[in-house]
């Protein structure tokens, strides 16, 4: 009858567990389990091997490590000391830690090892020459495997070795269990795949930086003269060719003198020099409308008029033209 009640409770637990969507494995999970243990007792105790039903509850400190409280009851076990069959009763409670291997999840196998301590109490036991109630403190070691039917329902099979610290005797057991777990995080979730970065927009082609080209003209004159000397024709021709290449350009031809002589005279002399250079440009193909000839007299010296060398530099016609390179 007790076995039927145990099975009924186990089946009810499974149905309840599968009805809670929040149940899971992993850190923070609580496991509840019903198990049945086959106990192989040390021969010195004169106790037949028996079957012990029990229950266990565990809490996962991490995804792999759980702390467990277990309780099982010794039923239907008898002495075999030759003095008559005596019914043996008692129980065992224990605190153990289980370390699991493998990944939690549906249809997964998780081997485990465990260790801890327990307390065992049995009545009508003859052990090492005495009888009565036997109390033992146990060191427990075990191993096994869990199979998870779902994230919440599992079956367990394992073996345990119990060492009695009081008398140095060993007992062994094999067990099977059926359990459920509640809560937890089902292990570390796989990180969501990093979305592919959006393609960089194709940069608009940069407008090419306009390159400025420039040509300059510097024609020198003899004292009190306005005649363009032959050695300057090439420079004037370069300016004319540049303006032909860039037909949108115009030019100012600026005439200058040194400081010798009256201002009014030098003003007229500088204008004549500018006009002469304009005439050469026109001969080289530049339209007159694109040329402005201006005389500045002695007002814009670029060198010292106190020396002959400086005055020679100041007797000049200047021009410069800029354009954007094609």
Curated annotation (Swiss-Prot):
According to the record, the signal peptide region is: 1-24
Residue ranges, annotated region (8 X 2 AA tandem repeats of X-P): 190-205
Name all OmpA-like domain ranges: 208-325
Is Protein transport included in the keywords of this UniProt record? no
Q: What is its main location?
A: membrane
Coiled-coil ranges from the UniProt annotation: none
- Gene Ontology annotations for the cellular component aspect, listed alphabetically: cell outer membrane; pore complex
Is the Signal keyword given for this protein? yes
Q: Which InterPro entries match?
A: Bact_OuterMem_StrucFunc, OMP/PagP_b-brl, OMP_bac, OmpA-like, OMPA-like_CS, OmpA-like_sf, OprF_membrane_N
Query: Which SUPFAM superfamilies does the record cross-reference, listed alphabetically?
Result: OMPA-like, OmpA-like
The protein's UniProt keywords, in alphabetical order, are: Cell outer membrane, Ion transport, Membrane, Porin, Repeat, Signal, Transmembrane, Transmembrane beta strand, Transport
Query: What is the membrane topology listed in the Swiss-Prot or TrEMBL record?
Result: Multi-pass membrane protein
GO terms for biological process? monoatomic ion transport
UniProt-annotated location(s): Cell outer membrane
Q: Give the GO molecular function terms.
A: porin activity
Query: Of which family is this protein a member?
Result: Belongs to the outer membrane OOP (TC 1.B.6) superfamily.
This chain belongs to which protein, by name?
Answer: Outer membrane porin F
Q: Which organism is it from?
A: Pseudomonas fluorescens
The gene name on file is oprF
């Amino acid at each position: 009858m007790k076995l039927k009640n145990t099975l009924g409770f186990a089946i009810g637990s499974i149905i309840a567990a599968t009805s809670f969507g929040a149940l899971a494995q992993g850190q923070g999970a609580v496991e509840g389990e019903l198990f049945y243990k086959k106990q192989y007792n040390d021969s010195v105790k004169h106790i037949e091997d028996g079957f012990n039903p029990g229950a266990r509850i565990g809490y996962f400190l991490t995804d792999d490590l759980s702390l467990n409280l277990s309780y099982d009851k010794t039923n239907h076990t008898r002495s075999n000391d030759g003095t008559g069959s005596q019914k043996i009763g008692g129980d065992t409670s224990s605190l153990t830690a289980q370390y699991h291997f493998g990944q939690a999840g549906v249809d997964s196998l998780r081997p485990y090892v465990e260790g801890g301590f327990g307390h065992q109490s049995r009545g009508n036991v003859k052990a090492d020459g005495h009888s009565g109630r036997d109390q033992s403190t146990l060191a427990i070691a075990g191993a096994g495997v869990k199979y998870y039917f779902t994230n919440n329902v599992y079956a367990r099979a394992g073996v345990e070795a119990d060492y009695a610290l009081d008398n140095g005797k060993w007992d062994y057991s094999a067990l099977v269990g059926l359990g459920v777990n509640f809560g937890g995080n089902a292990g570390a979730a796989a990180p969501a795949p990093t979305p592919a970065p959006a393609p960089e927009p194709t940069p608009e082609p940069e407008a090419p930086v306009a390159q400025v080209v420039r040509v300059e003209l510097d024609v020198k004159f003899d004292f009190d003269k306005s005649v363009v000397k032959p050695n300057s024709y090439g420079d004037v021709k370069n300016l004319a060719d540049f303006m032909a290449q860039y037909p949108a350009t115009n030019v100012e031809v600026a005439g200058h003198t040194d400081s010798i002589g009256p201002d009014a005279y030098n003003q007229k002399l500088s204008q004549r020099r500018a006009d002469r250079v304009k005439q050469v440009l026109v001969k080289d193909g530049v339209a007159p409308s694109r040329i402005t000839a201006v005389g500045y007299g002695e007002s814009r010296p670029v060198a010292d008029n106190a020396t002959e060398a400086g005055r020679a530099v100041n007797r000049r016609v200047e021009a410069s033209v800029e354009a954007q390179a094609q």
